[in-house]
Every structure is written in structure tokens, then in C-alpha cells.
Amino acid sequence: MKNTNKNNVNRREFLKTGAAITAATILPRWILGGAGFVAPSNKVYIAIVGAGGQGRTNADALMREADAEIVAICDPSEDADYSPFYYGGRAGRLPVKARIEAHYTKQKPDFKCKEYEDFRVMFEKEKGIDAVLVATPDHVHAVVTAAAMRLGKHVYCEKPLTHNIWEARQIAKIARETKVATQMGNQGHSGEGIRMTCEWIWAGAIGKITEVHAWSDAGGWAKGPGRPKETPPVPKGLNWDLWLGPRDYRPYHPAYHPYNWRGWWAFGTGAIGDMACHNLDPAVWALKLEAPISVEASSPGVDSEVVSQCAIYRYNFPARGDMPPVKVTWYDGGLRPERPEELEEDQVLGGGGNGILFIGEKGKIMCGGWGGTPVILPQSRMDEFQKPPKTIPRSKGHHRDWLDACKGGPQPSSNFEYAAKLTEIVLLGNVALRTRKKIYWDHENMRAKNAPEAEKFIKETYRKGWEVA
């Protein structure tokens, strides 16, 4: 539903009707929440910012929801070849626009999806959009997300929520102020596996947990050291300066766009930023983790420009209520924890190159990637375990929950308050890696007690016109 004065009038008339409500009535958010909330019976009109592989994937997911309509697509790149990469095929605003129009013209033959290079121009012209899905490279997440929320738009932002810790705090603050519906794109958070893991742990399935190991084989997107020396021409249809966004100008190189930006500190956050929002998520939720006391990281090589090919990160978290202190270790780039002796010979550690392992006083819980398919080790303990009641509300789907929130339903479970905390924990690991120090973290003041040089990684600088505000 587009934001129109008619809806405001309807809301005022409803509130003036004494027969409609009593003092004890609880009204849905779409009535009380102002023009930003969409009536449950209406469509949610959405703009997508970022039309790469993940933007295309999100568009497909939204097109499966009957009450969502993608009305605008924005990306500095018209068209790019993703066939050498995970996503395959082509992406960019023109291929994704064509995909969107092919879908909606089946119901509305005259349907047209608007296209834009610059999200700021789109926000100025497309006043009727209700919500924004952000699937840009990491370094632009916070800039677009903050601007959209300030305009009263509901926002779904891909993970990690931000590129640095200061941005995570700002985005959480703006979300609290604007009260829009928010969701980060760590899709496993809406899965059954992560809910089962939490419920089992809270029921004492493996007793007190003092150690967690999580991992992903992801990594190795860029090769260093330093920036590329070559300066090839910018491909036709790519606005390179716009793609750089808040970052200082540097010459175009295919090592950055369309895919391998993940391996450059200026644009990406490495494998831990890309995958720990999935695979560490069960630990943060189940163990009620907040700020760590300290974090340290090690890697065969640390470069000022290129993300390490592989690394290990070690976090120390304090006790939380009746939960004891816990050590959390993250591995990426093919590094793994030691294989548990309780695993059967034919059992895989985790699943698909990803996983998480909880070590408790009475046993272990192992999950695959995204917190999926939890099992208790050893198998004998799994066989005798009486599964507890399902106490966590089940999700209808990651995008579905967000759309329902846009219509006045409850905030999704990976809303920006939670997502900012998870993102901050993840990104603090990169601060330790880049400073090459064990960081003692002052959470309240957002600083590394023993490493003033970490400040430039905690809060980055921005080109004029690209500030997070």
C-alpha cells in the first residue's frame, strides 16, 4: 500500500469512532504507527537497492509473496556476468528488472519496474514505496539503510548489517527512533534448526556450555598484497564512482566488481562478515551473548588492503545470568575445529563446509550451516533425549515475517536491534585481526582499551554526501 493521505484520514476516522474501540482495546501497529504501516489487506510496494547476485535472489523470494510488489530496482551497474561465481547467470539492474517485469506482467500486462542508478534519486522520485530491500556490497549497507529508515521506509538489509561497529550502533539507534519494520538477511535465523538448538540448550540438553566452535569454508575472494596495479577501462553501463559510494576514489578493476569486493577491506568484511552472521547466530541467540570481554585473531598473512585468505578468531564472553563464561572460536577459509571423537566415521562435521559445535558439561550439540539440522553427540545421548516443548514462535519465512511486520505485525526475530548486536560481535573480530592485537573491549564507550589504532576500523571515514545520518 502506498503512503497516501487517504489512509491517514481512515485511521483518524477509525480512532474517533467510539463504538470501534474501548480503552482496553489493543490496536494493530498499522493503525497507530502512522503512514509507514501498510494495511493487512494491501500490497507492500518495495524498492530493491543492489541488483547483484544477492539482490536477484531476494527479488525471487519477494516475488513468491502475493502481497509484495517490487516497483523499483536500483544499482550503479546495468548488467554483469556472474557465471564464474556462486550465483551464476547475469545480474545488474537491467537483468533483474527484466526478471521482475516478466513475473508481474503475468497478472498486470502493463506493469513496469522503474530503474535507477542512484538510490538517492530513487528515494526523491518514488515517494510511494513502502519498503526497501538493501542488497548492495557491505560498504553501502548502512548509508542506504539509514536514509530509507529516516524516510519512514521499512528495511530488509542483507548481512552483515553494516561495514563497521559504529554503523551498527547508528542503525540500531535509527531503527528504535523510526520504529519501522526491520530484518537482516541471515535467513537461517528463521529456520527450525536454530529454534530447536536454542530450546534444547535452554532445556539443559548438554548442561552448562563453556565452549563454542563455528566455521565456514568461505574466503579467498581476493589476492594480495595491496591493490591491483592495472587500470583497465570501466565497463560500459557501470557508474564506478557511484559504486564506490562512501569510499575514497580508486581506479576500477574487475578484482572489485562484480563479485570479489568481499575480499577487500574497503568494501567487504571477509568470510567472518559474510558467514558468521549465519553460523555464529545460534550461539548468540542460544547463549544470550552480548559484548565480549576480549577478542584476538590470527592468520598466516594480514594485509592492509586484502582480507586474509583464512583466519581464526577467539572471543571471550563473561557469565550471563546462570550461564557461565564461554569461549567462542570462529574458523574460515578451510580451517576447522578438531573433529569431535563422538562423531561416527560416516558423520560429517557440520554440513556443506559450514557448522557450529557447542561443548557442554554433559555432551555436545552440532549443527550444519545456518544453524540447521542440530544433533546431540554422542548418539546415545541424542537417543535418550526428550525434546522440550516448542517455546519459540515459529517463523512463516524470513521475508514473510518482514512483510507481516510492514503490515503491523510483530518485529521479525532478526530485527535491527538483534542484528546490530550480532554484527558488532562479528566485526569486532576483524578489528582484532587488522590491529594484530588481542582487543580488550570497552563496550559502553565503543573502544579498544589497549589499542587506540583500532579507532579507524571501529568508525570509518565517508566521502561528502555519503554519511550515515
Segments (PLM) and residue ranges:
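Short, solvent-exposed turn/loop segments enriched in Gly/Ser/Thr/Pro and often Arg
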Residues: 116, 135-141, 161-163, 167-168, ...
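A contiguous active-site-proximal alpha/beta segment in oxidoreductase catalytic domains
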Residues: 154-156, 162-237
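Structural recognition of the beta-strand scaffold that forms the well-ordered cores
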Residues: 45-49, 70-75, 133-134, 156-157, ...
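Extracytoplasmic/secreted proteins, especially bacterial periplasmic and envelope-associated proteins
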Residues: 57, 91, 95, 118-121, ...
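Non-transmembrane alpha-helical segments in soluble domains
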Residues: 15, 59, 74, 97, ...
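Contiguous beta-strand/loop segments that form the cofactor/metal-binding neighborhood of enzyme cores
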Residues: 32, 196, 208-417, 423-469
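N-terminal glycine-/serine-/threonine-rich beta1-alpha1-beta2 phosphate-ribose binding loop
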Residues: 2-151, 169-181
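Secondary-structure transition/capping motifs at alpha-helix termini
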Residues: 65-68, 173-181, 203-207, 287-291, ...
